[in-house]
Amino acid sequence: MQFVSTRPQPQQLGIQGLGLDSGSWSWAQALPPEEVCHQEPALRGEMAEGMPPMQAQEWDMDARRPMPFQFPPFPDRAPVFPDRMMREPQLPTAEISLWTVVAAIQAVERKVDAQASQLLNLEGRTGTAEKKLADCEKTAVEFGNHMESKWAVLGTLLQEYGLLQRRLENLENLLRNRNFWVLRLPPGSKGEAPKVPVTFVDIAVYFSEDEWKNLDEWQKELYNNLVKENYKTLMSLDAEGSVPKPDAPVQAEPREEPCVWEQRHPEEREIPMDPEAGAEPLVPAQDASSQVKREDTLCVRGQRGLEERAIPTESITDSPISAQDLLSRIKQEEHQCVWDQQDLADRDIPTDPNSESLISAHDILSWIKQEEQPYPWGPRDSMDGELGLDSGPSDSLLMVKNPPPAPPQPQPQPQPPQPQLQSQPQPQSLPPIAVAENPGGPPSRGLLDDGFQVLPGERGSGEAPPGGDRSTGGGGGDGGGGGGGAEAGTGAGGGCGSCCPGGLRRSLLLHGARSKPYSCPECGKSFGVRKSLIIHHRSHTKERPYECAECEKSFNCHSGLIRHQMTHRGERPYKCSECEKTYSRKEHLQNHQRLHTGERPFQCALCGKSFIRKQNLLKHQRIHTGERPYTCGECGKSFRYKESLKDHLRVHSGGPGPGAPRQLPPPPERD
């Protein structure tokens, strides 16, 4: 290997002139540092070719002899160039090690960052899992509380079921013994005595046999529909829970009942109680009447429709039936009642035989079957005697007493054949049950000569009819005086002349018009029954006597409280058979079922448009009549719908106007 150098000799550079010893100079020192760094790798590469490793590291000075210039020998000092060449290869190794350490440190830092991010992610997931676990625990606690409430309701239902079974057994035993009924008024929720007794007479309608024959077919159909409607509303009484405790007896007041269309002699006013015997023991008329007419409370009927019981209504006339048939019919009605034994002597029964009047068995059935709900009739002249509708934990009491035996009396004269009830054949016709009226003095409700009665609310002030100072027991022959009856009915102010001597109740059936004798003195709205007027009057007085024990929400009627309590218990007893939806009220289910059947029974007579609900028809009719019943109290502007008035009131109150979105009302078929 030969090196050709173009550099000047040390003598040319003036080494001696610089004062440098020639023995200490090397050619590598004469080069700039940067050239030495660049040429050293090349030199090392050339030296490594064809030489062993050890020989490449040692410099053989003899190998340089062919070179054009040679360094002068320096015997006293080792050459610098070979030593420098041996030390230089160690520097890249140190540099490579430093960069490796830095790269390793950076890799470790990146791994630490990745582990830190994963740790943060795990912490977040742990927090989410803890929240879900807390929600699950809360849900489990709520579910446990819900199950406890359901178990409590189930226990209450089982207890009530046991009570109903015992009442039914008592009823069957009493009916088997052929006892009779005395209805009683239920006490209040706190056990207080009721204020006013109530009878079935206020909603009953009576016809004689001849008048029934003179009625047209549509009038008879109207009568049947009224009876069915009353009976259907009666089925909902069991949900009222208006049943007092048996240990809370209530004294009843004597009430007057309507007389029948035939007046009989006192010796004929008895009814045989045992049709199997020829000479049967007879019951005094006043005893039977005292047990029938003191109807102070309600009997809770079983929830069965009129169609299922096949009770005929079109053939019900004033035909008398035996007490046994009457009791068997009552038993078929499956009335679930609680009986309370009370001494007959404690009831102040009138004993004057001259104060008796006759009433047919049909009238008794009418009183029993047409009772809708606890009607707060109160006194006839005012609303002060409002019926307390607060109900206790048990059902209505029905007082039962065996009629005491009476002294033998002559057999009643045979009656002409009369049509019988269709529910069961009548082997014989017996005289009507005798009922006593108020002894000594004119009756508080006028009785007409033809046997019809002016019902409460049809006379206005409740006074006796003109010339009506005669008693019901005497002075009237068989049939009475028709002219006097017409005069009394006209003078009462509730009838429509000689065609309707019975007053507004008779006019309802003869002319098909619904009478509403009870008017509100404040707003003038009329009602057909006194109870509706009393409940309506509470809207003016802001009276809400029925309060929920759970949420303290109050209501103005007892039925509203009962429906509200069903929401606490989660009761939805009415279920659609097609879509399985359930409802808490029967009318909501009926409206919903019309969606399946497509029935729209309420049709506008002017434009022919039909509706599912009656309320929608009434709202629609305001378009034709121009009625705007909702008036703003601030600006006097009137509106057709209540929702429009609410939107308008928001303008006065500073809330969102009519254009603002509002929450949609629930579907019509839901609660």
Curated annotation (Swiss-Prot):
GO molecular-function terms, A-Z: DNA-binding transcription factor activity; sequence-specific double-stranded DNA binding; zinc ion binding
Main location: nucleus
Region called Disordered, residue ranges: 239-258, 373-486, 649-671
Tissue: Ubiquitous.
GO cellular component, one term: nucleus
CDD domains assigned: KRAB_A-box
Regions of compositional bias (Low complexity) in chain numbering: 385-398
Keywords: DNA-binding, Isopeptide bond, Metal-binding, Nucleus, Phosphoprotein, Repeat, Repressor, Transcription, Transcription regulation, Ubl conjugation, Zinc, Zinc-finger
InterPro entries named among the record's database cross-references: KRAB, KRAB_dom_sf, Znf_C2H2_sf, Znf_C2H2_type
A Pfam family: KRAB
Intracellular or extracellular location(s): Nucleus
Family: Belongs to the krueppel C2H2-type zinc-finger protein family.
Protein name per UniProt: Zinc finger protein 282
